[in-house]
Amino acid sequence: MSEHYYTKSPRSESDRRRFEAVLLGRRLTFETDAGVFSKSGVDFGSRLLIETADIPDGARVLDVGCGYGPIGLAIAAARPSARVTMLDINERAVGLARANAERNGIRNVTILASDGLEAVRGQTFDAVLTNPPIRAGKAVVHRIFEEAHGALAPGGVLWVVIQKKQGAPSAAAKLEELFGAEHVRMAARDKGYHILRAERANNC
Protein backbone atom coordinates (compact mmCIF):
# COMPACT_ATOMS: atom_id res chain seq x y z
CA MET A 1 0.00 0.00 0.00
CA SER A 2 1.38 3.42 -0.91
CA GLU A 3 2.22 5.95 1.76
CA HIS A 4 -0.58 8.18 2.97
CA TYR A 5 -0.37 11.69 1.46
CA TYR A 6 -1.80 13.26 4.66
CA THR A 7 1.62 12.99 6.29
CA LYS A 8 3.85 15.76 7.59
CA SER A 9 7.10 14.29 6.24
CA PRO A 10 6.59 11.66 3.51
CA ARG A 11 9.23 8.94 3.47
CA SER A 12 8.42 7.53 0.05
CA GLU A 13 11.24 7.68 -2.49
CA SER A 14 11.12 10.77 -4.68
CA ASP A 15 9.60 10.27 -8.13
CA ARG A 16 9.29 13.74 -9.61
CA ARG A 17 7.30 14.36 -12.76
CA ARG A 18 6.11 17.44 -14.62
CA PHE A 19 2.99 18.16 -16.63
CA GLU A 20 0.94 21.05 -18.00
CA ALA A 21 -2.72 21.75 -17.30
CA VAL A 22 -5.12 24.38 -18.60
CA LEU A 23 -7.09 25.75 -15.64
CA LEU A 24 -9.46 28.72 -15.88
CA GLY A 25 -8.12 29.37 -19.37
CA ARG A 26 -4.47 29.53 -18.32
CA ARG A 27 -1.79 26.97 -19.09
CA LEU A 28 0.16 26.15 -15.94
CA THR A 29 3.13 23.85 -15.42
CA PHE A 30 3.23 21.66 -12.32
CA GLU A 31 5.90 19.44 -10.84
CA THR A 32 4.68 16.67 -8.55
CA ASP A 33 6.28 13.85 -6.58
CA ALA A 34 5.55 10.64 -4.75
CA GLY A 35 3.84 11.11 -1.40
CA VAL A 36 1.48 13.87 -2.59
CA PHE A 37 -2.14 13.66 -3.72
CA SER A 38 -2.86 13.01 -7.41
CA LYS A 39 0.76 13.19 -8.54
CA SER A 40 -0.03 12.15 -12.13
CA GLY A 41 -2.23 15.12 -13.00
CA VAL A 42 -4.95 17.44 -11.76
CA ASP A 43 -7.75 15.21 -10.51
CA PHE A 44 -11.32 15.57 -11.74
CA GLY A 45 -12.66 16.76 -8.38
CA SER A 46 -10.13 19.57 -8.11
CA ARG A 47 -10.88 20.65 -11.68
CA LEU A 48 -14.59 20.75 -10.92
CA LEU A 49 -13.98 22.80 -7.79
CA ILE A 50 -11.74 25.26 -9.65
CA GLU A 51 -14.34 25.70 -12.39
CA THR A 52 -17.30 26.02 -10.01
CA ALA A 53 -16.04 28.29 -7.24
CA ASP A 54 -17.10 31.89 -7.79
CA ILE A 55 -14.19 33.93 -6.44
CA PRO A 56 -14.53 37.73 -6.62
CA ASP A 57 -11.64 39.97 -7.61
CA GLY A 58 -9.66 41.17 -4.62
CA ALA A 59 -10.83 38.33 -2.38
CA ARG A 60 -8.83 36.89 0.48
CA VAL A 61 -8.73 33.22 -0.45
CA LEU A 62 -7.61 30.16 1.52
CA ASP A 63 -6.81 26.77 -0.06
CA VAL A 64 -6.75 24.07 2.65
CA GLY A 65 -4.88 20.89 1.76
CA CYS A 66 -3.31 22.52 -1.28
CA GLY A 67 -1.04 19.63 -2.28
CA TYR A 68 1.31 20.69 -5.08
CA GLY A 69 -0.95 23.68 -5.73
CA PRO A 70 -3.46 23.29 -8.58
CA ILE A 71 -6.48 24.88 -6.87
CA GLY A 72 -4.84 27.86 -5.20
CA LEU A 73 -2.45 28.59 -8.06
CA ALA A 74 -5.19 28.40 -10.69
CA ILE A 75 -7.27 30.92 -8.75
CA ALA A 76 -4.30 33.18 -8.06
CA ALA A 77 -3.33 33.18 -11.74
CA ALA A 78 -6.90 33.97 -12.84
CA ARG A 79 -7.46 36.60 -10.12
CA PRO A 80 -4.26 38.67 -9.84
CA SER A 81 -5.91 41.04 -7.36
CA ALA A 82 -6.83 38.20 -5.01
CA ARG A 83 -4.60 37.30 -2.08
CA VAL A 84 -4.34 33.53 -1.90
CA THR A 85 -3.02 31.59 1.09
CA MET A 86 -2.33 27.88 0.62
CA LEU A 87 -1.88 25.34 3.42
CA ASP A 88 -0.87 21.70 3.67
CA ILE A 89 0.40 19.47 6.46
CA ASN A 90 2.63 17.66 3.93
CA GLU A 91 6.01 19.42 3.80
CA ARG A 92 6.89 17.85 0.46
CA ALA A 93 3.65 19.18 -1.02
CA VAL A 94 4.34 22.65 0.38
CA GLY A 95 7.78 22.69 -1.23
CA LEU A 96 6.31 21.65 -4.57
CA ALA A 97 3.55 24.26 -4.36
CA ARG A 98 6.08 27.01 -3.67
CA ALA A 99 8.23 25.86 -6.60
CA ASN A 100 5.17 25.68 -8.86
CA ALA A 101 4.16 29.21 -7.91
CA GLU A 102 7.65 30.41 -8.83
CA ARG A 103 7.69 28.31 -12.02
CA ASN A 104 4.46 29.94 -13.21
CA GLY A 105 5.35 33.47 -12.12
CA ILE A 106 2.50 33.64 -9.59
CA ARG A 107 3.27 36.19 -6.88
CA ASN A 108 -0.02 36.78 -5.08
CA VAL A 109 0.27 33.64 -2.95
CA THR A 110 1.53 32.67 0.49
CA ILE A 111 2.18 28.95 0.96
CA LEU A 112 2.58 27.52 4.46
CA ALA A 113 2.99 24.18 6.19
CA SER A 114 0.06 23.81 8.57
CA ASP A 115 -1.92 21.20 10.48
CA GLY A 116 -5.42 22.24 9.53
CA LEU A 117 -5.70 26.04 9.72
CA GLU A 118 -3.25 26.44 12.59
CA ALA A 119 -0.84 28.63 10.59
CA VAL A 120 -3.53 31.22 9.83
CA ARG A 121 -5.20 31.36 13.22
CA GLY A 122 -6.67 34.83 13.77
CA GLN A 123 -6.88 35.64 10.05
CA THR A 124 -10.15 35.91 8.12
CA PHE A 125 -10.94 35.03 4.52
CA ASP A 126 -13.64 35.74 1.96
CA ALA A 127 -13.43 32.25 0.47
CA VAL A 128 -12.05 28.92 1.64
CA LEU A 129 -11.64 26.02 -0.78
CA THR A 130 -10.79 22.43 0.04
CA ASN A 131 -10.52 19.06 -1.61
CA PRO A 132 -10.36 17.44 1.84
CA PRO A 133 -8.11 14.49 2.76
CA ILE A 134 -10.84 11.85 2.88
CA ARG A 135 -8.38 9.06 3.67
CA ALA A 136 -7.38 10.85 6.85
CA GLY A 137 -10.84 10.14 8.26
CA LYS A 138 -14.06 11.94 9.05
CA ALA A 139 -12.70 13.58 12.21
CA VAL A 140 -9.95 15.35 10.25
CA VAL A 141 -12.33 16.44 7.49
CA HIS A 142 -14.90 17.76 9.97
CA ARG A 143 -12.18 19.66 11.84
CA ILE A 144 -11.26 21.39 8.58
CA PHE A 145 -14.91 22.38 8.14
CA GLU A 146 -15.11 23.70 11.71
CA GLU A 147 -11.89 25.71 11.42
CA ALA A 148 -12.90 27.04 8.00
CA HIS A 149 -16.22 28.27 9.41
CA GLY A 150 -14.32 30.14 12.10
CA ALA A 151 -11.92 31.67 9.58
CA LEU A 152 -14.56 33.01 7.19
CA ALA A 153 -15.56 36.64 7.26
CA PRO A 154 -19.33 37.25 7.47
CA GLY A 155 -20.71 36.50 4.02
CA GLY A 156 -17.65 34.41 3.19
CA VAL A 157 -18.04 31.06 1.43
CA LEU A 158 -16.58 27.60 1.98
CA TRP A 159 -16.30 25.51 -1.19
CA VAL A 160 -15.85 21.74 -0.78
CA VAL A 161 -15.45 18.97 -3.35
CA ILE A 162 -16.27 15.45 -2.23
CA GLN A 163 -17.44 12.26 -3.91
CA LYS A 164 -20.87 10.96 -3.02
CA LYS A 165 -19.44 7.51 -2.28
CA GLN A 166 -16.79 9.03 0.00
CA GLY A 167 -19.24 10.84 2.23
CA ALA A 168 -20.86 13.79 0.48
CA PRO A 169 -24.17 13.37 2.37
CA SER A 170 -22.48 13.32 5.79
CA ALA A 171 -20.27 16.25 4.78
CA ALA A 172 -23.35 18.23 3.78
CA ALA A 173 -24.98 17.39 7.12
CA LYS A 174 -21.92 18.64 9.01
CA LEU A 175 -21.88 21.86 6.99
CA GLU A 176 -25.57 22.40 7.69
CA GLU A 177 -24.86 21.95 11.41
CA LEU A 178 -22.12 24.60 11.26
CA PHE A 179 -23.57 27.10 8.78
CA GLY A 180 -27.31 26.46 8.99
CA ALA A 181 -29.21 24.44 6.40
CA GLU A 182 -30.42 27.57 4.62
CA HIS A 183 -26.80 28.57 3.90
CA VAL A 184 -25.63 25.26 2.38
CA ARG A 185 -26.34 24.04 -1.14
CA MET A 186 -24.93 21.80 -3.83
CA ALA A 187 -23.32 24.13 -6.36
CA ALA A 188 -22.41 21.45 -8.91
CA ARG A 189 -22.47 17.70 -9.42
CA ASP A 190 -20.63 15.64 -12.04
CA LYS A 191 -19.43 12.03 -12.30
CA GLY A 192 -20.19 11.34 -8.65
CA TYR A 193 -18.43 14.46 -7.37
CA HIS A 194 -20.37 17.08 -5.42
CA ILE A 195 -19.37 20.70 -4.96
CA LEU A 196 -20.83 21.97 -1.69
CA ARG A 197 -21.17 25.69 -1.04
CA ALA A 198 -21.59 26.93 2.53
CA GLU A 199 -21.94 30.64 3.27
CA ARG A 200 -21.27 32.14 6.67
CA ALA A 201 -24.21 34.28 7.72
CA ASN A 202 -23.62 37.97 8.32
CA ASN A 203 -24.89 37.67 11.88
CA CYS A 204 -22.73 34.80 13.10
Annotate the PLM regions.
Residues 155-162:
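Conserved beta-strand signature within the Rossmann-like core of class I S-adenosyl-L-methionine
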